[in-house]
Amino acid sequence: MGKPWFVYLVRAANGSLYCGISDDPQRRFAAHQKGQGARYFKTSPAQALVYVEQWPDKSAALRQERLVKRLRKSAKEALVASFGGLGEISPCGASADPPRLSAAP
């Protein structure tokens, strides 16, 4: 099995949530804070890494990222509220099928 990948949410200064994937979300967040990587943070700087979930590989993380990006903001906020912090990152995708998220219609 390869290196795990992570889906993460970062809160921007304007209150919005940015979703991305990385094999090292803390390093990626530090890059976002420096204005590197995503153009998203040019207008509203990255403030906090608020949600992280681990996936077994990049492909699974990409599939989950697409699902999370399609969620309404209220559903993303629910993910953030359910997150116990960086010490509580547990592997997702133990089964062949990732959890089903309901995307906004």
Curated annotation (Swiss-Prot):
<dbReference type="InterPro" id="IPR050190">
    <property type="entry name" value="UPF0213_domain"/>
</dbReference>
<feature type="region of interest" description="Disordered">
    <location>
        <begin position="85"/>
        <end position="105"/>
    </location>
</feature>
<dbReference type="InterPro" id="IPR000305">
    <property type="entry name" value="GIY-YIG_endonuc"/>
</dbReference>
<protein>
    <recommendedName>
        <fullName>UPF0213 protein PP_0972</fullName>
    </recommendedName>
</protein>
<feature type="domain" description="GIY-YIG">
    <location>
        <begin position="3"/>
        <end position="78"/>
    </location>
</feature>
<comment type="similarity">
    <text>Belongs to the UPF0213 family.</text>
</comment>
<dbReference type="InterPro" id="IPR035901">
    <property type="entry name" value="GIY-YIG_endonuc_sf"/>
</dbReference>
<dbReference type="Pfam" id="PF01541">
    <property type="entry name" value="GIY-YIG"/>
</dbReference>
